[in-house]
C-alpha cells in the first residue's frame, strides 16, 4: 500500500455527516507508516461534484466519472476495510493538490 493509491473502501458504519458506504479513497499516509502499521490514513472521494470547495481536489479523468477528493473527510482506518487491489494511483501533480487541500483543511 502506497501513498497516492486509490482503493475501494467500505466506510460503514459511519455517523452523522461522515463519508459513508463503499467508495474510492486515496491513501495519504506516508509509505513507511503504511508498511509498518495495521492502519492507513485515507481521504474519501465522491462523484458529487456539484460544488468544489477550497479543500476539494477535482478529478476530471482519473476514475470512471468526474469526482473530487474531499480533504475534510480524512480518517485513519484499518487495512481490513480495503476492498481488493488499488484501482489507480493519483499522479504527483494531483497529490500536491491533495496535500495543499489537507494543509488548508487542517490549518497546517
Where are these regions (language model features)?
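Conserved functional hotspots at enzyme active or ligand-binding sites that engage polyanionic ligands
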Residues: 1-108
